[in-house]
Amino acid sequence: IDTAHGLGMSVMLDVVYNHFGPDGNYLPSYAAPFFRHDIPTPWGAAIDFRQPAVRRFFQENALYWLTEYRFDGLRLDAVHAIPDHDWLVELATFVRGQIPAPRRIHLVLENDDNRASLLDAGYDAQWNDDAHHVLHHLLTGEASGYYADYAARPGDNLARCLAEGWLFQGQPSEYRHGLPRGEPSAHLAPTSFVLFLQNHDQIGNRMRGDRLTDLAATRERLRAAVALQLLAPQIPLMFMGEEHGSQTPFLYFTSHADPELAAAVREGRRKEFASFPEFGGGDPNIPDPNSEATYAASNPWLKARGADGGEWLAWYGTLLRLRHHAISPRLAGTRSLGACSLGTHGVHAQWLLGDGALLTLYANMGAATQPLPPTLKPSEIHRAAMLFQSGEEAFSEACGGNLHRDSIIWLLEERS
């Protein structure tokens, strides 16, 4: 961590406070009151955050990582699985009180419940699963499982995610059997949301751990999605190997010492995918999670990068440098000016950056050219300064009133 700090890099730690591991956890044997048996979880009885000693245990653990090891922040795993929501507010208050300014501590959530109130109560940001799911559908066409909630009107869905953060802000979810999900989030800053195209869950939980380099409909569409992700005001997150277009799968792997537990996990994976015909219908050749070979096969550097890897590195490098110089210095105080869909697969969005500059996005994630509506005048595009285009013809075609297929355009207008 000290070495990273010397290089100007921050380091965050992913902490799991919603459960202990299923293997090697002996705490129930000598501290049974630590758990509550009225709430079962896939990992056993739930942790009892009603107990003051339990709450203090995890507060001290967070402080330990931040003070003894000097991590710059924590990413809290799956906090929707913690039934005592008030403890999360208590944790943020405790950490902020123990580590006051000027030291900056980042507290980031993974929360399937989309609780905006936590981002109003001491947490900095949340991983934006909604935006990922919309973009994944647009890139791959997949519409089963939880992607079913995002397959209808993907252009509208992406527009809402870019303008307001989450798609689900209290409306019912079909995938969750009609139960409401989420809280209103339009009042939050764009930097309250972490935007990603891939992560360890979204790849590793797939049957074969396949990446977007294998799944995306076209290479051009994936390049456009990367340009959207890295230049949007939301915080970009990249998964290892994305930057060089890795095609090595990231498989689901474990290291359980208990043979019975390893067998149960192996069988559970097969049953999980039995109802997904596109994933093999329970194919018995699913990689064994507890095999060391499965772990070894997930090394993102396993396959030689070649020329294609170099092209991806150059693509990411160009976009990250552009973000560093043109976007990041202006993010404080940025607010959305709204977004709208362009056809089924396109979107137009605008943000007023902190220094008054206007950032504009035109994206077409579809296979056909998308005519611009009369309300978006090509002459205004022509007058604006182009920040980036994902294809050589994208900007010129937009000036003529059409968005090229699988393309994206960013405009940046300075305002004094």
Per-segment meaning from a language model:
Residues 1-109, 116-118:
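Substrate-binding/active-site clefts of carbohydrate-active enzymes
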Residues 3-7, 61-64, 68, 91-94, ...:
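Generic, well-ordered alpha-helical scaffold segments in large soluble proteins
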Residues 8-11, 53, 57-60, 83-90, ...:
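Generic recognition of stable, solvent-exposed alpha-helical segments in well-folded globular domains
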Residues 25-28, 88-91, 121-123, 253-255, ...:
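Short, glycine/charged-enriched secondary-structure capping and boundary segments
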Residues 27, 56, 205-206, 361, ...:
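Extended hydrophobic-aromatic, low-complexity segments
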Residues 39-49, 199-213, 292-304:
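Short glycine/proline-rich turn/loop motifs
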Residues 92-280:
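Conserved alpha/beta catalytic core and glycan-binding cleft of carbohydrate-active enzymes
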Residues 210, 214-223, 228-238, 242-416:
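Carbohydrate-interacting/catalytic domains
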